[in-house]
């Protein structure tokens, strides 16, 4: 178990081995530290990917290169625990509450009765936030469009 001070290096780790999933398309890297992850994000080559360093409570933004590796990790938010999502250019970060950031600034905070563990967006109009917490599941309606500047 590491102390987390090498999180930036771990994000850019390039494994020598990988497996092909049963769909014949998905690559699963043989990553020595994947077992520590509790929340994986989906991204595409050339796009941004976000990861939370839970030990030091900070969010990293990386770019996915043409080979699927994470490059240029930078801290963009100095808080976070467990889960981060980029939805309509809003960065949602779970910690004591779920905070919504736009252009590096908090625009909204969603409080639930118990500390959130994970969350994701859903619903027909992608306006429903589903939150798992230590004592239950919560649902919140959100309007991310109203946060546009």
Language-model features: locations:
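Short loop/turn segments immediately following the C-termini of beta-strands
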Residues: 1-5, 54, 64, 95-96, ...
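A short loop-to-beta-strand structural motif that recurs across blades of beta-propeller domains
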Residues: 16-20, 58-60, 97-99, 136
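Predominantly five- to eight-bladed beta-propeller fold
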Residues: 9-10, 14-17, 146-149
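Glycine- and Gly-Pro-enriched alpha-helical subdomains that act as flexible
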Residues: 41-62, 66-73
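Beta-rich, blade/repeat-based domains predominating
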Residues: 1-4, 12-18, 29-48, 74-95, ...
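Beta-strand initiation motifs
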Residues: 21-28, 66-74, 105-108, 146-149
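Blade-level signature of beta-propeller repeat domains, shared across WD40, Kelch, NHL, RCC1
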Residues: 118-149
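Structural recognition of the beta-propeller blade-terminating site
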Residues: 20-23, 53, 63, 101-102, ...
């Amino acid at each position: 178990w590491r102390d987390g001070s090498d999180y930036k290096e771990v994000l850019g780790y390039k494994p020598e081995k990988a497996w092909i999933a049963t769909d014949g398309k998905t690559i699963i890297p043989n990553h020595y530290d994947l077992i520590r992850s509790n929340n994986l994000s989906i991204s595409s080559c050339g796009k941004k990917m976000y990861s939370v360093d839970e030990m030091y409570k900070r969010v990293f933004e990386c770019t996915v290169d043409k080979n699927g590796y994470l490059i240029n990790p930078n801290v963009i938010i100095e808080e976070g625990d467990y889960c981060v999502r980029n939805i309509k250019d809003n960065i949602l970060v779970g910690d004591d509450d779920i905070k919504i950031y736009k252009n590096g600034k908090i625009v909204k905070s969603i409080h639930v009765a118990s500390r959130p563990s994970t969350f994701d967006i859903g619903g027909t109009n992608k306006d429903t936030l589903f939150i798992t917490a230590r004592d239950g599941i919560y649902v919140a309606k959100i309007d991310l469009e109203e946060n546009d500047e």
